[in-house]
A protein has these predicted regions:
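Blade/loop signatures of beta-propeller domains
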Residues: 13-36, 176-179
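Short, conserved, GDST-rich strand-edge loop motifs in beta-rich repeat architectures
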Residues: 16-17, 69-77, 167-178, 217-236, ...
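Blade-loop segments of beta-propeller domains
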Residues: 45-54, 71-116
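Blade-terminus and WD-like Trp-Asp/Gly-His loop motifs, strongest in beta-propeller folds
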Residues: 53-64, 68, 102-117, 155-164, ...
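Conserved blade-ending motifs and adjacent loop-strand segments that build the rim/top face
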Residues: 256-259, 295-305, 338-366
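Loop/turn-rich, solvent-exposed surfaces of beta-rich toroidal or solenoidal domains
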Residues: 275-281, 295-340
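Blade-level signature of beta-propeller repeat domains, shared across WD40, Kelch, NHL, RCC1
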Residues: 361-401
Length: 401
């Protein structure tokens, strides 16, 4: 933890969530955990963390990237925009509408994204120069020639040298068939290297953090008939796939529960974790050995993230019935002591079940700044979302005898 503090202090003059005027202190009434809520716009506007595969905060602690809407879905809202909080200047700036979940380079403080509408192409924005797009390349012709591109990537990930982006695109062919295409896009010239296509709903693609020739993808909606037919034939629920160049795809079965969702790479790329199913836990797969273990004792986990040193896990849980906008709580789990604490013990339903949210308001907790903080979304009964940043040191102390 001392090393993390030194990294955070490397950029002189940067405020922290504890000291910045952009945050207000929040204390959970049951667990006593202290978090810091981002303050921007009106109190009932939406401030939402990024999807858990993408880290919301840069390693130097200066920039926090988040989604924002003026208003909320109960009272009416404006368009969703990507924003950045600059903790050096204690200011918030608009990054526009990237058209997808961006890749955040947490070491060099910039984002990369691809957009299909309104100036299609792939772009970069430096977070210290917000709002100025730098075009990298056009949408690859190798995709547009196949048909109508529905989306370019579920959430963008880049190669280690940041020169290429992994795409898991969806393309509607002229005959109406949907093809799911995986491969690498060279950002300097728009050349696309296809790794192959699937007829099953293949998405959630994530390039391995330390290997440019390996991606983790999901068979989305594997509970529907095609996935169930595959399970009847092979015995395995076909959620998690390792994808490599040349069309090589390897199913990684969830051997303990034969069900999986929301998989994510470890930061060191040596393995990945996932959630079992409602009422289940967080599991982990080691690439080298194939060993699978339960890494978190929180039942009902739906999204999880592992700390850079693999000692801690955060996850969110819907304590009652799940829907888009249901009640949530978020947990921290100490793998060394096998103890947990609630970052927030329960948040009320954001939206009623008969009128669900369209903003994907799940908490999506994830570690940032080399494990110093956890970032997640917290819902409120009046229909607005808050963004919480929670110091990890207190969570370790609370779960250590």
């Amino acid at each position: 933890m001392i090393a993390n503090l030194m990294l955070a202090a490397a950029l002189t003059g940067v405020h922290t969530p504890e000291t910045s005027k952009l945050f207000e202190r929040r204390t959970d009434p049951e667990s006593g955990v202290v978090s810091y809520s981002l303050v921007y716009g009106a109190p009932d506007d939406n401030r939402q963390s990024l999807y858990f595969v993408t880290k919301s905060m840069t390693e130097d602690g200066r920039f926090l990237v988040f989604n924002y809407t003026k208003g909320n879905e109960r009272k009416g809202r404006g368009p969703r925009k990507l924003m950045v909080a600059d903790l050096l200047k204690d200011e918030v700036h608009e990054l526009g509408d990237p058209g997808m979940i961006p890749f955040v380079d947490c070491k060099k403080d910039y984002i990369v994204y691809g957009r299909l509408k309104q100036k299609p192409g792939f772009y970069r924005q430096n977070l210290d120069d917000p709002g100025r797009e730098i075009k990298l390349c056009d949408i690859p012709g190798a995709l547009t020639e196949m048909g109508r591109v529905r989306y370019l990537a579920t959430h963008l990930t880049l190669t280690r040298d940041r020169s290429k982006a992994f795409l898991d695109a969806s393309v509607i062919a002229p005959n109406g068939a949907t093809n799911y295409v995986q491969g690498l896009l060279t950002l300097a010239n728009g050349v696309f290297e296809s790794w192959g296509t699937t007829d099953f709903f293949c998405n959630h693609g994530q390039l391995n953090p330390v290997r440019d020739d390996l991606a983790l993808c999901a068979w989305e909606e594997a509970w529907l008939k095609p996935g169930q037919d595959y399970k009847k034939t092979t015995g395995w629920y076909p959620r998690m796939w390792l994808v490599e160049p040349g069309g090589k795809r390897t199913l990684v079965p969830a051997r303990d529960r034969n069900c999986a969702s929301h998989e994510v790479w470890d930061d060191d790329g040596r393995g990945f974790s996932w959630c079992g199913r409602p009422g289940d836990y967080v599991y982990h797969h080691d690439l080298a050995t194939g060993r699978q273990e339960r890494w978190c004792g929180i039942a009902g986990a739906r999204h999880n993230n592992v700390s850079p040193d693999n000692r801690y896990v955060v996850c969110d849980e819907a304590p009652e019935r799940w829907w888009r906008g249901c009640k949530w709580r978020v947990a921290f789990w100490n793998r060394e002591t096998e103890r947990g604490v609630w970052i927030y013990s329960t948040r009320p339903a954001l939206m009623p079940r008969e009128k669900q949210s369209r903003l994907h308001p799940d908490p999506h907790p994830h570690f940032v700044m080399n494990g110093r903080y956890v970032v997640c979304t917290a819902n409120n009964a009046d229909g607005h979302m808050d963004l919480y940043v929670t110091p990890v040191d207190q969570l370790v102390k609370m779960t250590t005898p």
